[in-house]
Amino acid sequence: MRIHHEPIEVLHRRQDHSTAEHLLAPTLFETVSAPARSLVGVPVLESPPPTSHLRVFRWGSSVPCAWGHSAEPADGAVWRDSASKCDHGGMRSALVTHPSSLDHVAPWDHPERPERVTAAVEGARDSDAEIIEVAARKATRSELLAVHTERYLERLQELSTEGGGALDSDTYVSAASWKAAQFAAGAGLTAVEAIDAGHADFGFAAVRPPGHHAEAARAMGFCLLNNVAVTAAALVRRGARVAVVDWDAHHGNGTQDLFIGSPDVLYLSTHHAPFYPGTGRVEEVGGGLGTGTSVNIPLPGGSGGRSYRDAFARVVLPILGQYGPDWLLVSAGYDGHAEDPLGGMALIATDYEAMAASLGIAMDRTNTVFLLEGGYNLRAVKESVTATLNGFAFGSLPIERPRTGDPWVDHAVAVDSLFWDLD
Protein backbone atom coordinates (compact mmCIF):
# COMPACT_ATOMS: atom_id res chain seq x y z
CA MET A 1 0.00 0.00 0.00
CA ARG A 2 1.04 3.57 -0.61
CA ILE A 3 0.98 5.98 2.29
CA HIS A 4 -1.15 9.06 1.73
CA HIS A 5 1.16 11.53 3.45
CA GLU A 6 -1.36 14.36 3.56
CA PRO A 7 -4.50 12.58 4.69
CA ILE A 8 -7.76 14.21 3.78
CA GLU A 9 -10.22 14.98 6.51
CA VAL A 10 -12.81 12.33 5.88
CA LEU A 11 -15.65 13.36 8.12
CA HIS A 12 -16.57 16.14 10.51
CA ARG A 13 -16.47 14.85 14.05
CA ARG A 14 -19.61 16.68 15.08
CA GLN A 15 -22.92 14.89 14.89
CA ASP A 16 -26.39 16.26 15.48
CA HIS A 17 -28.36 13.84 17.63
CA SER A 18 -31.70 15.58 17.40
CA THR A 19 -34.55 13.11 17.16
CA ALA A 20 -37.54 13.10 14.85
CA GLU A 21 -40.65 11.05 15.39
CA HIS A 22 -41.56 8.64 12.62
CA LEU A 23 -44.60 6.60 11.81
CA LEU A 24 -44.48 3.39 9.82
CA ALA A 25 -47.48 2.02 8.01
CA PRO A 26 -48.23 -1.60 8.91
CA THR A 27 -47.57 -2.49 5.27
CA LEU A 28 -43.91 -1.39 5.25
CA PHE A 29 -42.18 -4.29 3.49
CA GLU A 30 -45.62 -5.88 4.11
CA THR A 31 -44.30 -7.48 7.30
CA VAL A 32 -43.31 -4.88 9.89
CA SER A 33 -44.47 -6.23 13.24
CA ALA A 34 -43.22 -3.55 15.64
CA PRO A 35 -43.82 0.21 15.84
CA ALA A 36 -41.14 2.46 14.46
CA ARG A 37 -38.76 4.03 16.93
CA SER A 38 -37.01 7.37 16.78
CA LEU A 39 -34.55 7.91 13.94
CA VAL A 40 -31.55 10.16 14.47
CA GLY A 41 -30.74 13.00 12.07
CA VAL A 42 -32.27 12.26 8.70
CA PRO A 43 -32.24 14.72 5.81
CA VAL A 44 -35.43 16.22 4.47
CA LEU A 45 -35.70 15.48 0.75
CA GLU A 46 -38.48 15.27 -1.79
CA SER A 47 -41.29 12.79 -1.29
CA PRO A 48 -40.79 9.23 -2.53
CA PRO A 49 -42.89 7.74 -5.31
CA PRO A 50 -46.43 6.88 -4.15
CA THR A 51 -45.71 3.16 -4.60
CA SER A 52 -42.63 3.19 -2.37
CA HIS A 53 -42.65 1.33 0.92
CA LEU A 54 -40.77 4.36 2.26
CA ARG A 55 -43.51 6.85 1.53
CA VAL A 56 -44.58 7.32 5.18
CA PHE A 57 -41.27 8.62 6.53
CA ARG A 58 -41.14 12.13 8.00
CA TRP A 59 -37.60 13.13 8.70
CA GLY A 60 -35.95 15.89 10.66
CA SER A 61 -32.56 17.52 10.72
CA SER A 62 -29.63 16.18 8.80
CA VAL A 63 -26.30 15.15 10.23
CA PRO A 64 -23.64 17.52 8.90
CA CYS A 65 -20.78 15.77 7.22
CA ALA A 66 -18.17 16.57 4.61
CA TRP A 67 -15.69 14.60 2.64
CA GLY A 68 -12.74 15.95 0.73
CA HIS A 69 -14.18 15.41 -2.73
CA SER A 70 -11.48 17.56 -4.31
CA ALA A 71 -8.75 15.31 -2.96
CA GLU A 72 -9.85 11.83 -3.90
CA PRO A 73 -7.55 9.16 -2.47
CA ALA A 74 -5.68 6.71 -4.63
CA ASP A 75 -7.20 3.24 -4.61
CA GLY A 76 -5.84 1.26 -1.67
CA ALA A 77 -4.01 4.26 -0.19
CA VAL A 78 -3.71 4.43 3.57
CA TRP A 79 -5.31 7.67 4.74
CA ARG A 80 -4.24 7.54 8.35
CA ASP A 81 -2.95 5.18 10.98
CA SER A 82 -4.90 6.35 13.99
CA ALA A 83 -4.07 4.48 17.18
CA SER A 84 -6.92 4.55 19.66
CA LYS A 85 -6.93 6.61 22.82
CA CYS A 86 -6.85 3.27 24.63
CA ASP A 87 -4.35 0.43 24.59
CA HIS A 88 -5.19 -1.43 21.39
CA GLY A 89 -3.24 -4.53 22.36
CA GLY A 90 -1.71 -4.78 18.90
CA MET A 91 -5.06 -5.54 17.22
CA ARG A 92 -5.35 -3.65 13.95
CA SER A 93 -8.50 -3.16 11.92
CA ALA A 94 -8.46 -1.98 8.32
CA LEU A 95 -11.27 0.57 8.08
CA VAL A 96 -12.06 0.59 4.37
CA THR A 97 -14.21 3.34 2.93
CA HIS A 98 -14.36 5.78 0.01
CA PRO A 99 -15.69 9.31 -0.63
CA SER A 100 -18.00 8.03 -3.38
CA SER A 101 -20.16 6.40 -0.70
CA LEU A 102 -21.48 9.88 0.13
CA ASP A 103 -22.43 10.66 -3.47
CA HIS A 104 -25.04 7.89 -3.85
CA VAL A 105 -28.13 9.93 -2.93
CA ALA A 106 -31.81 9.15 -3.42
CA PRO A 107 -34.13 11.59 -5.19
CA TRP A 108 -36.68 11.11 -2.39
CA ASP A 109 -36.76 10.63 1.38
CA HIS A 110 -34.81 7.45 2.01
CA PRO A 111 -33.39 5.72 5.10
CA GLU A 112 -30.37 4.37 3.17
CA ARG A 113 -28.48 7.65 3.17
CA PRO A 114 -24.87 8.91 3.17
CA GLU A 115 -24.81 9.71 6.88
CA ARG A 116 -24.86 5.99 7.63
CA VAL A 117 -21.24 5.80 6.49
CA THR A 118 -20.39 8.81 8.65
CA ALA A 119 -21.81 7.03 11.68
CA ALA A 120 -20.01 3.76 10.91
CA VAL A 121 -16.64 5.45 10.40
CA GLU A 122 -16.98 7.42 13.62
CA GLY A 123 -17.99 4.25 15.43
CA ALA A 124 -14.91 2.43 14.19
CA ARG A 125 -12.66 5.32 15.21
CA ASP A 126 -14.16 5.21 18.70
CA SER A 127 -13.20 1.56 19.16
CA ASP A 128 -10.16 0.40 21.11
CA ALA A 129 -8.59 -1.31 18.10
CA GLU A 130 -5.82 0.36 16.14
CA ILE A 131 -7.55 1.73 13.05
CA ILE A 132 -5.75 1.67 9.71
CA GLU A 133 -7.89 3.74 7.34
CA VAL A 134 -7.67 2.52 3.77
CA ALA A 135 -9.28 3.82 0.58
CA ALA A 136 -11.35 1.16 -1.16
CA ARG A 137 -10.44 0.18 -4.69
CA LYS A 138 -12.97 -0.48 -7.41
CA ALA A 139 -13.97 -4.04 -8.04
CA THR A 140 -12.82 -4.99 -11.53
CA ARG A 141 -15.22 -6.01 -14.26
CA SER A 142 -14.10 -9.62 -14.01
CA GLU A 143 -14.62 -9.59 -10.23
CA LEU A 144 -18.14 -8.27 -10.72
CA LEU A 145 -18.88 -10.78 -13.48
CA ALA A 146 -18.09 -13.62 -11.09
CA VAL A 147 -21.32 -12.62 -9.33
CA HIS A 148 -23.48 -10.54 -11.69
CA THR A 149 -24.48 -10.84 -15.34
CA GLU A 150 -22.96 -8.61 -18.01
CA ARG A 151 -26.37 -7.30 -19.03
CA TYR A 152 -27.21 -6.32 -15.48
CA LEU A 153 -23.93 -4.44 -15.04
CA GLU A 154 -24.50 -2.65 -18.34
CA ARG A 155 -27.99 -1.65 -17.23
CA LEU A 156 -26.75 -0.16 -13.95
CA GLN A 157 -23.95 1.71 -15.70
CA GLU A 158 -26.23 3.05 -18.43
CA LEU A 159 -28.91 4.18 -16.00
CA SER A 160 -26.35 5.97 -13.85
CA THR A 161 -24.75 7.63 -16.88
CA GLU A 162 -28.18 8.87 -17.94
CA GLY A 163 -28.71 10.52 -14.56
CA GLY A 164 -30.35 7.70 -12.64
CA GLY A 165 -33.83 6.49 -11.86
CA ALA A 166 -35.84 4.06 -9.77
CA LEU A 167 -35.16 0.33 -10.14
CA ASP A 168 -38.13 -0.52 -7.95
CA SER A 169 -40.22 1.31 -5.37
CA ASP A 170 -37.37 1.28 -2.83
CA THR A 171 -34.13 0.96 -4.82
CA TYR A 172 -32.65 3.73 -6.91
CA VAL A 173 -29.70 4.72 -9.07
CA SER A 174 -28.33 8.26 -9.19
CA ALA A 175 -25.72 9.76 -11.49
CA ALA A 176 -23.06 8.85 -8.90
CA SER A 177 -24.37 5.40 -7.99
CA TRP A 178 -22.40 3.30 -10.47
CA LYS A 179 -19.11 4.68 -9.23
CA ALA A 180 -20.14 4.29 -5.59
CA ALA A 181 -21.30 0.73 -6.18
CA GLN A 182 -18.01 -0.30 -7.79
CA PHE A 183 -16.04 1.02 -4.83
CA ALA A 184 -18.45 -0.58 -2.37
CA ALA A 185 -18.04 -3.90 -4.16
CA GLY A 186 -14.27 -3.52 -3.99
CA ALA A 187 -14.13 -2.58 -0.31
CA GLY A 188 -14.19 -6.15 0.98
CA LEU A 189 -11.47 -7.09 -1.49
CA THR A 190 -9.40 -4.14 -0.27
CA ALA A 191 -9.76 -5.32 3.32
CA VAL A 192 -8.67 -8.84 2.35
CA GLU A 193 -5.61 -7.39 0.61
CA ALA A 194 -4.74 -5.30 3.68
CA ILE A 195 -4.92 -8.40 5.87
CA ASP A 196 -2.90 -10.45 3.38
CA ALA A 197 -0.22 -7.75 3.29
CA GLY A 198 0.08 -7.76 7.08
CA HIS A 199 -1.27 -4.24 7.53
CA ALA A 200 -4.28 -5.38 9.56
CA ASP A 201 -5.63 -8.35 11.49
CA PHE A 202 -9.24 -7.91 10.38
CA GLY A 203 -11.30 -5.39 8.45
CA PHE A 204 -14.46 -3.31 8.45
CA ALA A 205 -15.86 -1.99 5.16
CA ALA A 206 -17.89 1.16 5.83
CA VAL A 207 -19.35 1.69 2.38
CA ARG A 208 -22.67 1.95 0.59
CA PRO A 209 -24.84 1.07 -1.23
CA PRO A 210 -25.27 -2.16 0.75
CA GLY A 211 -25.33 -5.46 -1.06
CA HIS A 212 -26.79 -8.63 0.45
CA HIS A 213 -30.18 -8.39 -1.32
CA ALA A 214 -28.65 -7.93 -4.79
CA GLU A 215 -29.03 -10.98 -7.02
CA ALA A 216 -27.12 -11.90 -10.16
CA ALA A 217 -29.34 -9.78 -12.40
CA ARG A 218 -31.55 -7.86 -10.01
CA ALA A 219 -31.25 -4.92 -7.63
CA MET A 220 -33.55 -4.85 -4.63
CA GLY A 221 -33.79 -3.84 -1.00
CA PHE A 222 -31.56 -0.74 -1.46
CA CYS A 223 -28.78 -2.98 -2.89
CA LEU A 224 -27.12 -2.69 -6.32
CA LEU A 225 -24.04 -4.96 -6.29
CA ASN A 226 -23.59 -7.79 -3.81
CA ASN A 227 -20.47 -6.61 -1.99
CA VAL A 228 -20.02 -9.62 0.27
CA ALA A 229 -20.61 -12.03 -2.62
CA VAL A 230 -18.00 -10.30 -4.79
CA THR A 231 -15.48 -10.73 -1.97
CA ALA A 232 -16.47 -14.34 -1.33
CA ALA A 233 -16.27 -15.28 -5.01
CA ALA A 234 -12.77 -13.81 -5.30
CA LEU A 235 -11.62 -15.78 -2.26
CA VAL A 236 -13.13 -19.00 -3.61
CA ARG A 237 -11.32 -18.50 -6.92
CA ARG A 238 -8.02 -18.61 -5.08
CA GLY A 239 -8.98 -21.84 -3.32
CA ALA A 240 -10.30 -20.57 0.02
CA ARG A 241 -13.24 -21.89 1.99
CA VAL A 242 -15.47 -18.99 2.95
CA ALA A 243 -18.16 -18.54 5.57
CA VAL A 244 -20.64 -15.66 5.54
CA VAL A 245 -22.45 -14.75 8.75
CA ASP A 246 -25.35 -12.39 8.09
CA TRP A 247 -26.88 -10.76 11.19
CA ASP A 248 -28.84 -8.08 9.32
CA ALA A 249 -32.52 -7.99 10.32
CA HIS A 250 -33.44 -8.87 6.74
CA HIS A 251 -32.51 -12.16 5.11
CA GLY A 252 -29.72 -11.86 2.54
CA ASN A 253 -31.60 -13.49 -0.30
CA GLY A 254 -29.02 -12.39 -2.87
CA THR A 255 -26.03 -13.88 -1.09
CA GLN A 256 -27.83 -17.14 -0.39
CA ASP A 257 -29.04 -17.46 -3.98
CA LEU A 258 -25.62 -16.77 -5.49
CA PHE A 259 -23.97 -19.61 -3.55
CA ILE A 260 -26.94 -21.94 -3.12
CA GLY A 261 -25.18 -24.91 -4.74
CA SER A 262 -21.60 -24.22 -3.68
CA PRO A 263 -19.82 -26.28 -1.01
CA ASP A 264 -17.13 -23.58 -0.85
CA VAL A 265 -19.33 -20.88 0.72
CA LEU A 266 -21.22 -21.45 3.96
CA TYR A 267 -24.05 -18.96 4.50
CA LEU A 268 -25.48 -18.52 8.00
CA SER A 269 -28.25 -16.00 8.61
CA THR A 270 -30.17 -14.79 11.64
CA HIS A 271 -33.08 -12.60 10.57
CA HIS A 272 -36.57 -11.31 11.34
CA ALA A 273 -39.36 -13.50 9.98
CA PRO A 274 -41.84 -13.26 8.47
CA PHE A 275 -40.35 -10.15 6.97
CA TYR A 276 -38.90 -8.64 3.81
CA PRO A 277 -37.77 -10.14 1.43
CA GLY A 278 -39.80 -13.24 2.33
CA THR A 279 -36.93 -15.72 2.01
CA GLY A 280 -34.79 -17.44 4.63
CA ARG A 281 -36.97 -20.27 5.87
CA VAL A 282 -35.21 -22.90 7.97
CA GLU A 283 -35.91 -25.44 5.24
CA GLU A 284 -33.83 -23.47 2.70
CA VAL A 285 -30.68 -25.56 3.17
CA GLY A 286 -29.02 -25.30 -0.23
CA GLY A 287 -28.85 -27.82 -3.02
CA GLY A 288 -26.56 -30.14 -4.94
CA LEU A 289 -23.02 -30.16 -3.60
CA GLY A 290 -23.99 -27.22 -1.41
CA THR A 291 -26.76 -28.99 0.47
CA GLY A 292 -26.49 -28.01 4.10
CA THR A 293 -24.39 -24.90 3.47
CA SER A 294 -27.36 -22.52 3.65
CA VAL A 295 -28.24 -22.19 7.32
CA ASN A 296 -31.21 -20.00 8.20
CA ILE A 297 -32.35 -19.08 11.69
CA PRO A 298 -35.49 -16.96 11.32
CA LEU A 299 -36.61 -15.20 14.50
CA PRO A 300 -39.89 -13.44 15.30
CA GLY A 301 -40.23 -9.69 15.51
CA GLY A 302 -39.07 -8.24 18.80
CA SER A 303 -36.34 -10.84 19.31
CA GLY A 304 -33.36 -9.58 21.26
CA GLY A 305 -30.06 -10.67 22.71
CA ARG A 306 -31.32 -13.82 24.37
CA SER A 307 -32.63 -15.32 21.12
CA TYR A 308 -29.58 -14.27 19.11
CA ARG A 309 -27.18 -15.65 21.70
CA ASP A 310 -29.11 -18.92 21.67
CA ALA A 311 -28.87 -19.01 17.85
CA PHE A 312 -25.13 -18.37 17.94
CA ALA A 313 -24.42 -20.83 20.75
CA ARG A 314 -26.45 -23.71 19.31
CA VAL A 315 -26.25 -23.22 15.53
CA VAL A 316 -23.91 -20.54 14.16
CA LEU A 317 -20.78 -21.28 16.18
CA PRO A 318 -20.94 -25.11 16.09
CA ILE A 319 -21.47 -25.13 12.32
CA LEU A 320 -18.79 -22.52 11.77
CA GLY A 321 -16.35 -24.65 13.76
CA GLN A 322 -17.21 -27.81 11.85
CA TYR A 323 -16.96 -26.09 8.48
CA GLY A 324 -13.52 -24.62 9.24
CA PRO A 325 -13.47 -21.58 6.94
CA ASP A 326 -10.26 -19.95 5.79
CA TRP A 327 -12.06 -16.60 5.69
CA LEU A 328 -15.11 -15.19 7.44
CA LEU A 329 -17.20 -12.40 5.94
CA VAL A 330 -19.86 -10.77 8.08
CA SER A 331 -22.85 -8.99 6.55
CA ALA A 332 -22.95 -6.49 9.40
CA GLY A 333 -26.38 -4.96 9.32
CA TYR A 334 -27.44 -2.97 12.36
CA ASP A 335 -31.17 -2.74 11.64
CA GLY A 336 -31.74 -5.40 14.29
CA HIS A 337 -31.03 -2.72 16.91
CA ALA A 338 -33.98 -1.84 19.15
CA GLU A 339 -33.83 1.81 18.00
CA ASP A 340 -33.87 1.02 14.29
CA PRO A 341 -37.04 2.16 12.47
CA LEU A 342 -37.11 -0.70 9.96
CA GLY A 343 -35.82 -3.90 11.55
CA GLY A 344 -38.44 -4.65 14.18
CA MET A 345 -35.96 -6.39 16.49
CA ALA A 346 -34.61 -5.61 19.98
CA LEU A 347 -30.82 -5.94 19.95
CA ILE A 348 -28.54 -3.47 21.73
CA ALA A 349 -24.88 -2.63 21.16
CA THR A 350 -23.63 -5.16 23.70
CA ASP A 351 -25.38 -7.93 21.78
CA TYR A 352 -23.39 -7.06 18.67
CA GLU A 353 -20.28 -6.99 20.83
CA ALA A 354 -21.04 -10.49 22.12
CA MET A 355 -21.71 -11.89 18.64
CA ALA A 356 -18.54 -10.31 17.27
CA ALA A 357 -16.53 -11.59 20.24
CA SER A 358 -17.69 -15.13 19.59
CA LEU A 359 -16.64 -14.81 15.94
CA GLY A 360 -13.29 -13.37 16.98
CA ILE A 361 -12.65 -16.39 19.17
CA ALA A 362 -13.76 -18.76 16.40
CA MET A 363 -11.48 -17.11 13.82
CA ASP A 364 -8.52 -16.47 16.13
CA ARG A 365 -9.19 -12.74 15.52
CA THR A 366 -7.94 -12.74 11.94
CA ASN A 367 -9.01 -13.37 8.32
CA THR A 368 -12.37 -11.70 8.95
CA VAL A 369 -14.03 -8.78 7.18
CA PHE A 370 -17.20 -7.04 8.34
CA LEU A 371 -19.17 -5.29 5.59
CA LEU A 372 -21.83 -2.70 6.40
CA GLU A 373 -25.32 -3.71 5.31
CA GLY A 374 -28.44 -2.17 6.90
CA GLY A 375 -28.91 0.01 9.96
CA TYR A 376 -30.89 3.24 9.78
CA ASN A 377 -30.62 4.86 13.21
CA LEU A 378 -27.34 6.74 13.14
CA ARG A 379 -26.64 6.64 16.85
CA ALA A 380 -27.35 2.91 16.95
CA VAL A 381 -25.06 2.30 13.97
CA LYS A 382 -22.22 4.27 15.51
CA GLU A 383 -22.46 2.58 18.91
CA SER A 384 -22.91 -0.88 17.41
CA VAL A 385 -19.90 -0.56 15.10
CA THR A 386 -17.76 0.46 18.08
CA ALA A 387 -19.06 -2.56 19.97
CA THR A 388 -18.45 -4.86 16.99
CA LEU A 389 -14.79 -3.92 16.63
CA ASN A 390 -14.18 -4.07 20.37
CA GLY A 391 -15.89 -7.42 20.64
CA PHE A 392 -14.01 -9.01 17.76
CA ALA A 393 -10.63 -7.65 18.81
CA PHE A 394 -10.82 -8.09 22.57
CA GLY A 395 -13.91 -10.06 23.60
CA SER A 396 -12.94 -13.02 25.75
CA LEU A 397 -16.23 -14.39 27.08
CA PRO A 398 -17.82 -16.98 24.78
CA ILE A 399 -21.55 -16.82 24.16
CA GLU A 400 -23.27 -19.21 26.54
CA ARG A 401 -26.36 -21.23 25.75
CA PRO A 402 -29.43 -19.98 27.66
CA ARG A 403 -30.98 -22.38 30.13
CA THR A 404 -34.20 -22.45 28.14
CA GLY A 405 -33.84 -22.57 24.37
CA ASP A 406 -35.75 -20.37 21.95
CA PRO A 407 -38.38 -22.50 20.14
CA TRP A 408 -37.48 -20.89 16.81
CA VAL A 409 -33.86 -21.89 17.37
CA ASP A 410 -35.05 -25.36 18.37
CA HIS A 411 -36.60 -25.71 14.91
CA ALA A 412 -33.38 -24.62 13.20
CA VAL A 413 -31.42 -27.14 15.27
CA ALA A 414 -33.81 -29.92 14.28
CA VAL A 415 -33.47 -29.18 10.55
CA ASP A 416 -29.76 -28.41 10.43
CA SER A 417 -28.89 -31.46 12.53
CA LEU A 418 -29.46 -33.44 9.33
CA PHE A 419 -26.20 -31.95 8.03
CA TRP A 420 -24.24 -30.87 11.11
CA ASP A 421 -23.50 -32.21 14.57
CA LEU A 422 -25.85 -30.11 16.72
CA ASP A 423 -27.53 -30.81 20.05
Regions found by a protein language model. Name each.
Residues 87, 92-95, 155-423:
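A general "terminal functional-core" signal
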Residues 8-78:
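Polybasic, low-complexity intrinsically disordered segments
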